[in-house]
Amino acid sequence: MIYVVPDLLEEIFLGLPLKSILRFKTVSKQWRSILESKSFAERRLNVEKKEKILAVGDRTELGFEGEEEIQMVYLHCDIDATRPSLTCEGLVCIPAPGWINVLNPSTRQLRRFPCSPNHHVPSDRIRFQFRDELYLTSFPGNWEMGFGRDKFNGSYKVVRMCFSPVEKCEVLDVETGEWSELNPPPNDIDVGRKSVCVNGSIYWLKNV
């Protein structure tokens, strides 16, 4: 096999469609390492032009019409996936009872992390009725969730906070899969509101 320097390989890979990238991961350890690296993921996110729609459920029942400018990514999940999800730089965080799921729609890679050992908060859930199905409108256990990228070390992190009946704040490092505990903020967060990550900081609306 002709040797090609890694930098040149990365430039070639950037111009390939997703199906080719997924297939080329199996060619060699070197190629897989390049295609799964942070730098490649960031560069591909910047050059990606097509809009993506993440569809959760049974592919045969989805009613989207195909368009050249839209790329569909299908994720087969149970009803827990209908709860609110969080996004950051192309990644999707889907909390579920007992688990934190982080999905990369571009590569179809899904990582699952168990909740921290200290997860013992009662899980009363807010629900609403829609087409004879119960859909969750808050995160598991009424935790307030946040998802973003640490601007200091570049790792993606999931933050969750609870204010009743106990006050807790926990952070999951997606790189290591480890949980850490922090002091909760002085003010309650508005239940049901999603967070947003801007320049490495996560923001919520607070109760007044």
UniProtKB/Swiss-Prot annotation:
The keyword Ribosomal protein does not apply. InterPro entries: F-box-like_dom_sf, F-box_dom, SCF_F-box_component. Signal peptide: none annotated. Gene3D superfamilies: 1.20.1280.50. It holds the Pfam family F-box. It comes from the Eukaryota. Residues 1-44 form the F-box domain. Kelch repeats lie at residues 149-200. Coiled coil: none annotated. Keywords: Kelch repeat. It comes from Arabidopsis thaliana. This is F-box/kelch-repeat protein At2g43270.
